[in-house]
Every structure is written in structure tokens, then in C-alpha cells.
Regions:
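Short acidic, glycine/serine/threonine-rich loops at helix termini
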Residues: 17-22, 77-79, 127-129, 156
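Internal helix-turn-beta structural module
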Residues: 128-132, 136-172
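Signal for well-folded cores of large energy- and translation-related assemblies
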Residues: 14, 28, 43-46, 50, ...
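Mobile "lid/hinge" segments at catalytic clefts and subdomain interfaces of large enzymes
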Residues: 14-74
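A short beta-alpha structural unit
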Residues: 65-67, 111-123, 151-161
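A glycine- and small/hydrophobic-rich beta-loop-beta segment
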Residues: 70-146
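Short, small-residue-biased leader/transition segments that mark boundaries at the very start
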Residues: 2-6
């Protein structure tokens, strides 16, 4: 099985939008895993963690996320899909989602961490489109920072997200 030993370090809390921005993240594990499988795991994990955070709406050209595996765990090397890969992927995703939330909560001027979960969308892409519209919305940010639960602003952001939405089924 994949090692339970992970080390992590991430930094960056400005110019984090939409895809990592000027953040740095270095991850290490003792797991034995092939370069192809670790690359696949990292790309899929970054897509659903670091590439989904927004702090200030500005994008930087500089970002890095690296994962290194030294193989010292002594596990049978992960060279393809299967239970061991799924375990490794789940652990890597957990670590990256945690780091992404920490970066967003430490954002320049951030007083709150807002997460948006979309359920019932026709596709993951539409759900992501709606969620990003909500968390990027300056009006939603003002409402959250001012502790004014103005749900109309959330609905407005969902409406202009560009996804197919049946407004009669929306519940905020």
C-alpha cells in the first residue's frame, strides 16, 4: 500500500487566480510509484485543488507544484491503476486540497475562506463553471466579508456563469 508518510510545503497568497498563480508547492512521499503514475496523480489532483482557488482575481505567470517520491516505503511499486494507486491518489488529493485552502485563507486581505459546492449539475465542468463564478464575484466577496448573507448575489453569479441552469431547481 502507499506510504502514509507525506511531507508538504506550500506558499503563495497573492495573485492566485485562476490556476495556481504565484504559488509554490513541494510535496514528498516515501511511496514507490512510477514517474507516469505520479505525474497522472499530480495533474489530476492539481486540477481539482490548486486550479480551483481564487484570492484576488489576478493571474501570475509563475507557479510550481512538484511531488517527489523516493520509494523508501518498501511498497510494491505503483505502475498502473489499481487499489494502491487509488489510495495514493486519495492521499495526494487530500494534501493538495488542504494546502489550497490554507493558501486561500492566507490570501492578501482575506478575512474569510469561502467554499462553494455545486450539486446536481449536468457535468463536472458546469459545476466548476458555476462555483468559480460564485467565488470570483466581487459582490459575493463583499457580502461574505461584510457578513451580509445576500443570496441574490450568489444566484446572480450562478446566472452569468454560462452553464445551463434550471433556476427553479436552485437552492442556496
Amino acid at each position: 500500500a502507499a506510504s502514509d508518510v507525506y511531507k508538504r510545503q506550500a506558499k503563495g497568497s497573492g495573485m492566485i487566480h485562476p490556476n495556481m498563480g504565484t504559488m509554490l508547492c513541494f510535496l514528498t512521499t516515501d511511496c514507490a510509484i512510477s514517474p507516469e503514475m505520479i505525474k497522472s496523480a499530480l495533474l489530476d489532483t492539481v486540477r481539482v485543488s490548486f486550479n480551483r482557488i481564487s484570492v484576488d482575481g489576478d493571474t501570475s505567470t509563475n507557479d510550481t507544484c512538484v511531488v517527489l517520491a523516493n520509494g523508501l516505503a518498501g511498497n510494491t511499486p505503483i505502475t498502473g491503476p489499481g487499489a494502491d494507486y487509488d489510495t495514493f491518489f486519495a492521499a495526494l488529493r487530500h494534501v493538495c486540497e488542504y494546502e489550497a485552502k490554507m493558501i486561500a485563507s492566507d490570501g492578501e486581505g482575506a478575512g474569510r475562506l469561502v467554499t462553494c459546492t455545486v450539486q446536481g449539475a449536468e457535468t463536472e465542468e458546469q459545476a466548476e463553471q458555476m462555483a468559480k463564478a460564485v467565488v470570483r464575484s466581487p459582490l459575493v466577496k463583499c457580502a461574505m466579508f461584510g457578513t451580509d448573507a445576500n443570496w441574490g448575489r450568489v444566484l446572480c453569479a450562478i446566472g452569468y456563469a454560462g452553464a445551463d441552469v434550471d433556476v427553479s431547481k436552485v437552492d442556496v
